[in-house]
């Protein structure tokens, strides 16, 4: 946010947006990690997008209204009224001061904003499903566009050693199966992660897009009233994490602060956390994967009127965006 904790119903951001000259023929995306609450995005005075939801990410394709080698005027208008009953505000106080379990308010851009240039035929997403019972990883890719004879090559590494590879013709929604021999499981005690490289290639075999990621092979299910991890009963010792920071309220002061939250929790004997009434930054989940930490994510649903249809619409659409971001 803007480090101003009063009730702010309207605010504006403005800055110049310089497009590198070597971004010709690229799809240019403008990403917002989270803006509380309704964001209107303008470029050169033209409204190009509106997003409702203070905790979910959104991206805008600005290729058609920007020009490589030029500078544009970017304006973000934010509306935030936690008294309306139409928006989820979590533990933000509806009174001037904090009280009970309601704390300092957040308004405006509170997560990372960045711009990137990608191939128009690049990989849009890849949903991973670890099937430890069959010793395999199932990957479902989506692409921005698909050209004739375009292929996707997926390579899985165990500590820089190639252990599986698959090449397939690009198709949205295909389920691609890679066998994992001598599989290493992920758990809080042994948080092993496999590295994955995705390469999209054109008809000539040239790499037009490359994405590097990771995956943990693990299974979670409930049976006989018990929680199971990797087919074994598992006792969760969870801390309740509210994600408030003196320096930035909802915004962590640094990546190290997010990592330290998990390190301190594990040192105290906890193996996971209930993330209470807040959608945490993606980097928090990254460190949870790397360090071995179970997370139960909870939407900041407080503040909505149960009688307002618009509040339900706002909640459901935003929650789906959060689920899409954190589904793996």
Cite the ranges covered by each PLM segment:
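Active-site mouth of glycoside hydrolases
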Residues: 55-63, 83-88, 93-94, 103, ...
């Amino acid at each position: 946010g803007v480090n101003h904790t009063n009730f702010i119903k309207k605010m504006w951001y403005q800055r110049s947006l310089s497009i590198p000259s070597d971004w010709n023929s690229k799809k240019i995306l403008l990403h917002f990690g989270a803006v509380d609450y309704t964001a209107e995005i303008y470029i050169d005075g033209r409204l190009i997008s509106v997003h409702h939801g203070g905790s979910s990410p959104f991206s805008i394709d600005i290729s058609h209204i920007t020009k490589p080698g030029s500078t544009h005027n970017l304006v973000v208008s934010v509306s935030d009224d936690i008294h309306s009953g139409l928006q989820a505000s979590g533990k933000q106080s509806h009174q001037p001061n904090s009280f009970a379990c309601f704390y300092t308010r957040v308004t405006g851009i509170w997560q990372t904003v960045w711009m990137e240039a990608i191939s128009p035929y690049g990989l849009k997403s890849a949903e991973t499903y670890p099937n430890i019972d069959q010793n395999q990883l199932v990957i479902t890719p989506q692409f921005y566009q698909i050209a004739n004879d375009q292929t996707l090559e997926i390579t899985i590494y165990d500590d820089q050693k190639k252990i599986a590879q698959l090449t397939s013709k690009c198709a949205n929604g295909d389920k691609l199966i890679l066998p994992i021999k001598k599989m290493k499981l992920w758990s809080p005690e042994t948080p092993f992660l496999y590295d994955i490289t995705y390469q999209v290639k054109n008809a000539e075999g040239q790499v037009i897009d490359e994405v590097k990621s990771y995956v943990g092979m693990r299974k979670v299910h409930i049976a006989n009233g018990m929680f199971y991890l990797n087919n074994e009963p598992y006792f969760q010792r969870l801390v309740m994490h509210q994600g408030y920071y003196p320096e930035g309220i909802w915004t962590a002061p640094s990546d190290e602060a997010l990592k330290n939250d998990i390190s301190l929790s594990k040192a105290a004997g906890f193996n996971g956390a209930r993330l209470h009434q807040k959608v945490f930054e993606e980097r928090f989940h990254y460190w949870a994967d790397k360090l071995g930490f179970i997370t139960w994510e909870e939407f900041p649903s407080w503040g909505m009127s149960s009688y307002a249809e618009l509040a339900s619409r706002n909640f459901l659409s935003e929650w789906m965006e959060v689920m899409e971001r954190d589904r793996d």
